[in-house]
Amino acid sequence: MPPLILLLSAAHPPDDMRVVRKEGAALAAAGFRVLHLCPGPGGRLPPVAGVEIETLAAPSRRALWRPLWRRVLALRPAAIHASEPDAWVLAVRAARRLGARAVLDVHEHYPSRLDARLPAPLRPLARLALRAALRAIAARADALVHAKSGLAADFPGHPRQVEVRNHALVPEGLPRRAHGPGPLTLLHLGAIGVKRGWPQMLAALSLCPAKTRLLVIGRFTDGSEAAFRAEAARRGLAGRIELAGWMPAEAALARAAAEADVNLILFQPGEENHRLALPHKLFDGMALGLPVIAPGFALPVAEIVQGAGCGLLVDVTRPAAIAAAVAELADPARRAALGEAGWRAARGEWGWPGEAARLLALYRALLG
């Protein structure tokens, strides 16, 4: 039987795009047995992309630790691939107990996570403390995997670090948006909240032609849905907006391909993770052939949008700048040209296969 790689999550959903549909699927396709152990209703769920799914029910994230620990030890994996800092702790402890390999997946810039909760004078000290704690955990791991460029700087001296970025995963048979004349439908795909720019999104929509629509596919992650609805109503926009909620990936992409004309990425400045962001929604839109309106301050996003020529970079703090970009994309030929560039880039330089190859090379070196 092939060695078991355990994908360990303390917070990610059972069919998470990066953990399961990208990383796990790539490992399973290469012949490894892969299981995702994560929060959920409890028990086994149907496999996703060749990855076994096992969930543990708990009333809180902290209450999940002990069941996770017991189950990891019972499964006796050859490698534990952990996706959050609290899961990292479990992974390195369990790996030492079992003689397994521990791989820590660094999804974001964790030292800045407390910035929004602290007064500005305390933030540098908090970053130093968090960075020191994370380095201490990482020092006990066999390898670090980084979801975007720039994260390795927090772990100087670790001998085995690999970038496996969230580049475009293009499912077979993915529909492609056909661009034609008519009113535009703007798309926000994925998690949404105040810091992801919905106030600016609504203000920009109010500056667009009256038949311009907004389609939101995803969850509010900051509890602001009621405020969103109230602001939309205050601006007289409620009839132009559809909140479709969360959808499985296949359904979300099919809906976007059928209806959306422009992909919006409007997260706001002020957070290090926004500056370094490399969101799945960028690549999903590219894979569908949608032009994107994106923030110019987000360095990886700006590099891709400029390099691929697949959209417009704007000051996302200014609704007028967003609305002006929407007006530029009212021309179907312009949308089609930018969308075509993104469609090709998602299947070429910015596609997932190159990232998957680095992940597979790492695991082949670790497990032989």
List PLM regions with ranges.
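Conserved donor-binding/catalytic core segment of Leloir-type glycosyltransferases
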Residues: L6-L8, V145, H179-L205, L215-V216
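Nucleotide-sugar-dependent
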Residues: H12-R18, R196, A249-A257, N263-F283, ...
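Membrane-proximal helix-turn-helix segments that form the acceptor-binding/catalytic region
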Residues: A25, R66-L73, R93-R97, L104, ...
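Glycosyltransferase donor-sugar binding loop
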Residues: P39-G42, L214-F228, G245-W246
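Donor nucleotide-sugar binding/catalytic pocket of nucleotide-sugar-dependent glycosyltransferases
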Residues: E54, R127-P175, E242
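Nucleotide-activated donor-binding/catalytic signature segment of Leloir-type glycosyltransferases, i.e.
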Residues: A226-A256, V262
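Conserved acidic donor-binding segment of nucleotide-sugar-dependent glycosyltransferases
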Residues: G307-P319, V326-A333
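A charged, aromatic-enriched C-terminal amphipathic alpha-helix characteristic of glycosyltransferases
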Residues: T317, A321, A333-Y363
